């Protein structure tokens, strides 16, 4: 195998396997390595590519040295010592999004942010379908991007994580946005500013930047070539909220579009998502009627502030996707404002090095009891114990039972962990499913 053209894929999950399939289809020489002894796709890989070198249980410096280019899976940090050493030597290190960007010519809508990106990506994709466009919704959502190149759609709507953006250099989008920023993945970034810089890469070579007017610190110093299109709940923006006939309505540049009461989801963070989706859709020239019709009918996504059931006049919400402090803060604030009573919060898991103190004010205002689970429950207790009643649970089943005992008619039980799930569950979906099943069994 010639090292002059050798590509080394680091990481053999879904993304790594999709990269292997893409390179194999192009007859590009490649090898694969993963530090795990049994990475998720290794059995599929060796059946399909029995003659391709696969190193498991370690990273091989010798193989990395031989590579002309390295494709890094998003789960592997650029700070991994052997990877950082290759980068310092000037080796090209890319991700699957970069490989995708080099090989597509169709318009791309690109979306990132700490919270709401899956919802906004989904909504924009549905808006395009409602307008009769053939669209592929992919990236950090659904199937890997490299599996969506053939057959090629009319449009791509991409959800992108900071990890994916770090290794992307050729993305040229019709419109792109950073929805918001709050602490997340601080186990991978030294500072919040480093995390923001990774996110800001989404605006490189973007034709129409879409910006959050409520968080100007994200974008105000960036050298945009074109005037941004903005959305915002609190500040003057192209897409905003306005009072009309004693009703709060969505407005575009001062023109009333529809009252928020017509939306099935009209809590504060849902409205921000709707405004962002409208701005992105406008940049993609989707007719406003199609977008408004879609928003009226949209009832949300599983595990994202999803209403589960009412039991003894207590409402139960599954926000298992609330894997960081910002997401949980937004969920507490939105549901707290709408609740007749108070909130009982189920939180905890792997905190990823986050600072939990931004939860203090909303917990003090809306939460009468917190049920803590998981690895970083002691850190959450240390932050919140002076503010509200703290209880602990060893399982989701116990957490739901304790929450139900603490709740009264009109209260809300909210699972929004502010943490990753891997200490107790397979992933956040598994955590949300266990919560939902437990609630439905009450």
UniProtKB/Swiss-Prot annotation:
Its EC number is 6.3.2.9. GO terms for cellular component: cytoplasm. ATP binds at residues 113-119. The keyword Protein transport does not apply. Pathway: Cell wall biogenesis; peptidoglycan biosynthesis. One of its GO terms (molecular function) is UDP-N-acetylmuramoylalanine-D-glutamate ligase activity. Keywords: ATP-binding, Cell cycle, Cell division, Cell shape, Cell wall biogenesis/degradation, Cytoplasm, Ligase, Nucleotide-binding, Peptidoglycan synthesis. InterPro entries: Mur-like_cat_sf, Mur_ligase_C, Mur_ligase_C_dom_sf, Mur_ligase_cen, MurD. GO terms for biological process: cell division; cell wall organization; peptidoglycan biosynthetic process; regulation of cell shape. It catalyses: UDP-N-acetyl-alpha-D-muramoyl-L-alanine + D-glutamate + ATP = UDP-N-acetyl-alpha-D-muramoyl-L-alanyl-D-glutamate + ADP + phosphate + H(+). The keyword Cell division applies. It is found in: Cytoplasm. It holds the Pfam family Mur_ligase_M. It is an enzyme of class 6 (ligase). Belongs to the MurCDEF family. Cell wall formation. Catalyzes the addition of glutamate to the nucleotide precursor UDP-N-acetylmuramoyl-L-alanine (UMA). This is UDP-N-acetylmuramoylalanine--D-glutamate ligase. It comes from Coxiella burnetii (strain CbuK_Q154). The lineage of its organism: Bacteria, Pseudomonadati, Pseudomonadota, Gammaproteobacteria, Legionellales.
